[in-house]
């Protein structure tokens, strides 16, 4: 057992002893629930922070505050609530009357304080403590070096501690909530209806990914946590709801990385009588307005860069992007879509770039992998990438001028994909054939290929109007708005391996 663990156990024992010592003096409960707060710290700062010391004394304003003790220096306490921090001061008369109880307070305890509001000589507001009540005794101490809480793994495993001590973490999740609310409000103003679709699917679909599998005991059948809500949302468009959206979780049984978590949040929406170009315009409008609303500017820092959400956003085909970011590669500069259709040509090109390839990859998959290897990470400013091949876009409508590609885009910022959208495939026969091609790919070893969904084909046979749909990764978008570079910093409880 380490010295640090021994010291922590000693502190826990001391705090338990303090709790036991006050129990006999508690007529009802050592964890009372009758104290009522009148103000939060930030409210007091906003309403009275500009007053002079003399004005506050003349006002004689009494308040009740509540929160966690974050510092204790002699007769001063620093109390933190959800809005911020404020000091409380115990006068000598109070200390004499409540000295033993006051000395028993520890950093981390949650207390309620009532008293008159004053201004210190340094210009800080404080509550002159007339009475206080211990509301919750903290049995575990905060980390000794809690300012900053440098241990990343502890921050993720004990997010509650991280939120107590790390203002940046609190602000990140406050911003996350604001981003989600702003997106929801934007969609409602655009006359989209918010809906909820199943989280457990009989057939996983809507994206190319490996699903989580569970078992429904009552029905005695396997079920899958959803990898995307797409096929259910489009069924609703078939049913006559012309504009729908959903903000919810998706689950993909894949690896962990700074940009991937198996459980993540998406906003997915569908819009009848629109195409993928309409979605790009809508995305520009949404993100620029949200940035200005939440940050006061369309420009925001991201690492060493400044991302400009003001628009218009760049629009490049995947082939154009590969050529733009490989200016010295003569083969790539001369490449055409006819060559992209040649799987052997694409294999040789990928190998020449030092890439490891899978034998079942199609020409479209090879093009996408080359794009990811050489171009994607360089797309710092908002950029729409179009021209995705049909073989990697099984639910997207083919382009009228070039049937090899689809009317699809992915949206990139900060070197990563944030959104994916396309004009929907509403040809039931074409969709049937593409599902069958996905089954063949799965049989060939691609465990991320889609399943065949016969009921969805039936829905299409009833008629899906011309429709466009898009998914936006909320977690990755919040990473941009909070200038963070790992997805775990914007997910409250990210996936972690069990501790040994």
Swiss-Prot record:
Record field: catalytic activity: tRNA(Lys) + L-lysine + ATP = L-lysyl-tRNA(Lys) + AMP + diphosphate
Enzyme's top EC category: ligase
Binding site for Mg(2+) 1: 410, 417
EC number(s) per entry: 6.1.1.6
Gene Ontology terms describing biological process: lysyl-tRNA aminoacylation
Main location: cytoplasm
Keywords: Aminoacyl-tRNA synthetase, ATP-binding, Cytoplasm, Ligase, Magnesium, Metal-binding, Nucleotide-binding, Protein biosynthesis
Disulfide-bond pairs as recorded: none
Residues at which Mg(2+) 2 binds: 417
GO molecular function: ATP binding; lysine-tRNA ligase activity; magnesium ion binding; tRNA binding
Quaternary data: Homodimer.
Protein name: Lysine--tRNA ligase
Organism encoding this protein: Shewanella baltica (strain OS155 / ATCC BAA-1091)
Source species taxonomy: Bacteria, Pseudomonadati, Pseudomonadota, Gammaproteobacteria, Alteromonadales
Protein encoded by which gene: lysS
């Amino acid at each position: 057992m380490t010295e640090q663990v021994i010291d922590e156990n000693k502190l826990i024992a001391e705090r338990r002893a303090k709790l036991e010592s006050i129990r006999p003096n508690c007529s009802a409960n050592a964890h009372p629930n009758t104290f009522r707060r009148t103000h939060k710290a930030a409210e007091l700062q906003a309403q009275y922070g500009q007053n002079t010391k003399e004005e506050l004394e003349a006002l004689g304003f009494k308040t009740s505050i509540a929160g966690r003790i974050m510092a204790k220096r002699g007769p001063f306490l620093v109390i933190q609530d959800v809005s911020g921090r404020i000091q409380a001061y115990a006068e000598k008369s109070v200390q004499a009357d409540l000295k033993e109880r006051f000395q028993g307070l520890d950093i981390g305890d949650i207390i309620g304080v009532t008293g008159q509001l004053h201004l210190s000589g340094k210009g800080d507001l404080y509550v002159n403590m007339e009475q206080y009540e211990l509301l919750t005794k903290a049995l575990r101490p905060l980390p000794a070096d809690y300012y900053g809480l440098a241990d990343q793994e502890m921050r993720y495993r004990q997010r509650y501690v991280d939120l107590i001590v790390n203002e940046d973490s609190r602000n990140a999740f406050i911003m996350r909530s604001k981003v989600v609310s702003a997106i929801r409000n934007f969609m409602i103003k655009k006359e989209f209806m918010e809906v909820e679709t199943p989280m457990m699917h009989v057939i996983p679909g809507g994206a190319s990914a490996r699903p989580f599998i569970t078992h429904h005991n009552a029905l005695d059948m396997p079920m899958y946590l959803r990898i995307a809500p797409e096929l259910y949302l489009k069924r609703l468009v078939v049913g006559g709801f012309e504009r729908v959206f959903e903000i919810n979780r998706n689950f993909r049984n894949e690896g962990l990385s700074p940009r991937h978590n198996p459980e993540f949040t998406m906003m997915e929406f569908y819009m009848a009588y629109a195409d993928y170009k309409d979605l790009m315009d809508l995305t520009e409008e949404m993100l620029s307005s949200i940035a200005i609303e939440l940050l006061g500017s369309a420009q925001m820092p991201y690492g060493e860069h400044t991302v400009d959400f003001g628009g218009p956003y760049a629009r490049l085909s995947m082939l154009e992007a590969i050529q733009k970011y490989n200016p010295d590669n003569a083969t790539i500069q001369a490449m055409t879509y006819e060559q992209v259709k040649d799987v052997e040509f694409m294999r040789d090109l990928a190998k020449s770039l030092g890439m490891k390839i899978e034998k079942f990859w199609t020409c479209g998959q090879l093009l996408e992998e080359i794009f990811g290897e050489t171009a994607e990470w360089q797309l710092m400013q908002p950029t729409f990438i179009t021209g995705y091949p049909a073989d990697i876009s099984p639910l997207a409508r083919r382009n009228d001028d070039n049937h090899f590609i689809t009317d699809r885009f992915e949206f990139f910022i900060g070197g990563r994909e944030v959104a994916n959208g396309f004009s929907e495939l509403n040809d039931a026969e074409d969709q049937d054939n593409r599902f069958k091609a996905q089954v063949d790919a799965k049989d060939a070893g691609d465990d991320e290929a889609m399943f065949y969904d016969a009921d969805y084909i039936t829905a299409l046979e009833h008629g899906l109007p011309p429709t466009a749909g898009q998914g936006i990764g909320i977690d990755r978008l919040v990473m941009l708005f909070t200038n963070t570079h790992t997805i775990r910093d914007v997910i409250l409880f990210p996936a972690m391996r069990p501790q040994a």
